[in-house]
Swiss-Prot record:
The keyword Hydrolase does not apply. GO terms for biological process: queuosine biosynthetic process. Its EC number is 6.3.4.20. Binds 1 zinc ion per subunit. The gene is queC. It comes from the Bacteria. Its cofactor is Zn(2+). Belongs to the QueC family. It comes from Rhizobium rhizogenes (strain K84 / ATCC BAA-868) (Agrobacterium radiobacter). Keywords: ATP-binding, Ligase, Metal-binding, Nucleotide-binding, Queuosine biosynthesis, Zinc. It is an enzyme of class 6 (ligase). SUPFAM superfamilies: Adenine nucleotide alpha hydrolases-like. This is 7-cyano-7-deazaguanine synthase.
Length: 236
């Protein structure tokens, strides 16, 4: 199956790229510059494409992104510290982000005669990101079936949608994903902060998976406090 992977450069999507390269026919990676403050993640996506020997496209949608106001990822709003399940983490939502990116990715896939678009949404995203939940994935596939009817048949491959980030770490280790060559931190500094929701989830995932975390965090122990009182199980 010829597959294009939507790759941000983060742990999840880079692990997915390595999985697809091992199990399917990976024909390229596509990334999106939407004006995110952690744009450095795109460098890690480019490195992944080079490592796997496939083309890499960075689609500039900053003109769209600047209109999706109110998010800590694109606006002058502080990125909150803590666990993803906390109410404050809603500040990291970029409205309709995945729907916009996937619509473009499906267009690319149809033009390139690909069979599938792969996306690394996972169970840990369900807390606050509605466009990462199973209902969205199913509905998007149905919509694309109509949008491309008679022209192309492209499947949405989301193998992690019902699994935890710890499961992704386990799967990534199996496919020899170089975790040190991935970027998660929403703050986009020189090092992973260790305090934002995605850093906390990343650190916890390695712990739960029993896999050594090679990440250099500014605050490597904050995750313990942040995760106390929260279950790693997903909100379905």
């Amino acid at each position: 199956m010829k597959t294009i992977v939507v790759c941000s450069g983060g742990l999840d999507s880079v692990s997915l790229a390595h999985k697809v390269a091992a199990e399917q026919q990976l024909i390229g990676l596509v990334s999106f510059d939407y004006g995110q403050r952690h744009r450095k993640e795109l460098d890690f996506a480019a490195a992944c494409a080079k490592r796997l020997g496939v083309p890499h496209e960075i689609i500039d949608i900053t003109t769209i992104g600047k209109h999706l106001t109110g998010s800590a990822l694109t606006d002058d709003v502080d990125v909150p510290d803590g666990h993803y399940a906390e109410e404050t983490m809603k500040a990291t939502v970029v409205p309709n982000r995945n729907a916009i990116m996937l619509a473009i990715a499906f267009g690319l896939a149809a033009a390139q005669k690909a069979d599938a678009v792969a996306v690394a949404v996972h169970g840990g995203d369900h807390f606050i990101y509605p466009d990462c939940r199973p209902g969205f994935i199913d509905a998007f596939q149905q919509m694309q079936n109509q949008a491309l009817d008679g022209y192309a048949s492209v499947s949405l491959y989301a193998p992690f949608v019902m699994t935890s980030k710890a499961d992704i770490v386990t799967d990534g280790a199996r496919h020899k994903t170089p975790f040190a060559e991935t970027w998660s931190c929403y703050k986009g500094g020189e090092r992973h902060c260790g305090r934002c929701g995605t850093c906390v989830e990343r650190r916890e995932a390695f712990h739960l998976a029993g896999v050594e975390d090679p990440t250099d965090y500014e605050d490597p122990d904050f995750w313990v406090t942040a995760t106390s009182g929260f279950s790693a199980q997903e909100v379905k």
